[in-house]
């Protein structure tokens, strides 16, 4: 299994893991858990879920997640 996309900085350090879903798929805890499992090996500081209708972004802080109100700009990653 693998994630759908990773955003990297110019030093090729991973900044954000992205999991895309179909518009008919609700962004549930199960979907979030899938991204979190992928991140166990990658250790990316941000997780994003998107189904084309809504997006959820969470910052990973010491094995806890802080949900963000909006998708950060690339320059702010």
Predicted regions and their residues:
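A short, conserved, highly charged catalytic patch centered on acidic carboxylates
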Residues: 1-46, 53-77
């Amino acid at each position: 299994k693998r994630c759908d996309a990773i955003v990297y900085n110019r030093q090729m350090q991973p900044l954000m893991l992205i999991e895309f879903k179909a518009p008919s798929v609700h962004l549930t805890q199960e979907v979030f858990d899938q991204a979190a499992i992928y991140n166990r090996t990658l250790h990316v500081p941000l997780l994003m879920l998107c189904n084309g209708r809504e997006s959820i972004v969470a910052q990973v802080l010491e094995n806890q997640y802080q949900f963000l109100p909006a998708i950060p700009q690339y320059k702010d990653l």
